[in-house]
Structure formats: C-alpha cells, structure tokens
Amino acid sequence: MDEIVDFSYDAVHDIDPGSNHIAIEPGEQLTMEECLNAILIRSANEVSFAVAEHISGTTWQDFAPIMNERAKELGCVDSNFVNPNGLPNEDHYTSAYDLAMIGRAFFANEALCKMTMTHMLHILPSERQPDDIMEVNKMELIPGGKYAYPYLVGCKTGYTDVARSTLVSCAEKDGMKLICVVMKDENPNYYEDTIALFDYGFSNFQRAVSYTHLRAHETPEHLV
C-alpha cells in the first residue's frame, strides 16, 4: 500500500474528456493506497491509468492482458478488457456472472471493502503532489446514505452513457454473504433494486455445504 505510483503524461492525458478525475498532473506521485481510494471513491480515470502503468511496468494498454488473465483465474467466462477504467469500447465487455466472480475476490479483501465504505476521500498535500484533495463518497448504500443498508460489506458503482448505471455490492447477514450485481440500471433505482435483491436472498437462501469434491464412495466425516 505504501509503494509509490508515478503519473506519466499519457496516464493523465489519455483519459476521455469529461471523465472522472482528481486533477493529478504529470510528474506527481501518490501512494498505492491513495490511488486505490481515488479509484474506488471517485472513479478517477487518470489514477486507473497510472496504476495500470505501474503494474504492467510499461504502458496502461499493456495492463489489459494482465486483467484478462486474472479474470480467467477468477472464473470469468464472458469478459474481455482493453482498458483499465471500463470506459466504452466495442472490444471491452463483461457479464453479471463475471462481475460477481471478480467481486467475490474483491470483497474477500477487508482493506478494499473498508475503502468503499469511507465517507470522504482525503489526500493530503506532500512533496509528491501539492494539492489538498477532498472528494465526498456519493455511494448511498453506506452508513449515513439515503439508502443505507445495514448488512453492507462493500460496493462499487460504475456509469457510462452506454452501459448506464452498474452496481456490484456485497452484504453479510447471519453468517451468509451474498454478492449482488445490477447492470444497465438507473440512479437511484439501482440502490432500490440492490436492496430488494439482497432482502430476497437473505429471506430465501441458506448456507449449504457442497460435497461435489468427494468421490462417489466417500462420506463426509460429520455424517459417519
């Protein structure tokens, strides 16, 4: 989390005009933790590009193959990524199932979940960047939000004119954790739809142990 991420000219200026950003300038630096907070709370596109360059070691474009390989490892079957920020491209696509697979890995990380529940992004000025950056988390499912959901573990929104509103979220109640994916929805409907789906799941699903890994002649120990 403390590693330093450099912002190149391309990372700052390759983002689409009018897309979300936090006004970082070329040559400035943030820690990885600051970058992740900016991506999760503000959907900062130049930060996504800088992190992609940092991880790939070259260009943000070279990060896409890494994303695709990791997606396959997580069980994704209907996705192809060509950029690190999810803005529209005919060759960039995913599905609700695949977002749930990615979400399952994401929500297993407590530090990332905590970031999504933070009410305010605050990056203090430093020798690496001069600005006092403050952005309010507009997510309405978190505590204090208009649609605050008491069992929420974490969440991430997305929006483009093409895809409309997307919300991937996780909630836990009575030891059961559910992941909800809502796509091509509208704000604020996607909050209401997410809550309705979680409430349905918690009312109608229950935890069960899968024995599919056992051979035909084997019996679970607790049944012997």
Say what each PLM segment does.
Residues 76-80, 88-93, 97-215, 220, ...:
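Domain-terminus/edge residues, biased toward the C-terminal soluble/receptor-binding domains
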Residues 1-97, 106-107:
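Active-site-adjacent loops and short helices of periplasmic peptidoglycan-processing enzymes
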